[in-house]
């Protein structure tokens, strides 16, 4: 597990966060602080509010009420610059090669430094596959390419929605290993997943959600009584 201390200012703070879609409240007054340099697993049933929380922290959903503070900032542009978001399903172009996908997103971020591309690709282990069309990738390779896209602008915080979805166990464990290394290099990582057992021994904290609220935070995978 990460050895990062909790004495520095939290990386992410949400205060009384509410998000409504029409009459449905997807988030119901969520307040929490998350330290930097840690890996958090966000768990709960479908409809618990996991992805909505992730998207709201990322700035993709505007909160109905409440505040999101990332690295002490509430400025939307500053927050977006510090966050890498991996969507589910992945936002990749099948007809383009892996490198073409990265360069497309790199242009959006204004990345011109070639070493940034090289380092990102090396970090996810996709060097030999860059010239192949993404449509020919296995699901595990697609997920690693999605992770590369999220990491390309060197954000301090990664928000990953179902990164282990539809991949075989070997690919999933490879992804977990990558994420642990990335966390150990100082990134803060939030992972929404229904495959919590993959993160046992890797996650610093398990965050349990139900009905749009965080109901418990545990150091181990044993669920709290409310969701047992």
Question: Which residue stretches match the model-derived regions?
Answer:
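Helix-to-loop junction immediately C-terminal to a conserved catalytic motif
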Residues: 58
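Conserved ABC transporter NBD signature motif
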Residues: 66-79
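Conserved ABC ATPase "signature" region
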Residues: 103, 114-129
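Catalytic Walker B motif of ABC-type/P-loop ATPase nucleotide-binding domains
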Residues: 158-161
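H-loop/switch region of ABC-family ATPase nucleotide-binding domains
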Residues: 192-194
């Amino acid at each position: 597990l990460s050895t990062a201390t909790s004495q520095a200012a939290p990386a992410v703070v949400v205060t009384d966060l509410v998000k409504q879609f029409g009459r449905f409240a997807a988030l119901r007054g969520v307040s929490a602080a998350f330290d930097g340099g840690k890996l958090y697993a966000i768990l709960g049933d479908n409809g618990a509010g996991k992805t909505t929380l992730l998207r709201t922290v990322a700035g993709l959903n505007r909160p109905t009420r409440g505040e999101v503070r990332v690295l002490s900032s509430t400025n939307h542009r500053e927050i977006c610059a510090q966050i890498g978001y991996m969507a589910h399903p992945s936002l990749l172009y099948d007809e383009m090669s892996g490198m073409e996908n990265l360069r497309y997103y790199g242009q959006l971020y204004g990345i011109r430094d070639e070493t940034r591309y090289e380092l990102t690709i090396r970090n996810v282990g996709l060097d030999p596959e860059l010239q192949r069309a993404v449509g020919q990738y296995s699901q595990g390779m697609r997920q690693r390419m999605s992770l590369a896209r999220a990491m390309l602008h060197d954000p301090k915080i990664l928000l990953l929605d179902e990164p282990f979805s539809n991949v075989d166990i070997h690919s999933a464990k490879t992804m977990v290993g990558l994420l642990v290394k990335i966390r150990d290099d100082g990134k803060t990582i939030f992972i929404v997943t229904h495959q919590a057992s993959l993160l046992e021994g890797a996650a610093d904290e398990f965050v349990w959600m139900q009905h749009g609220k965080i109901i418990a935070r545990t150091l181990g995978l044993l669920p709290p009584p409310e969701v047992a």
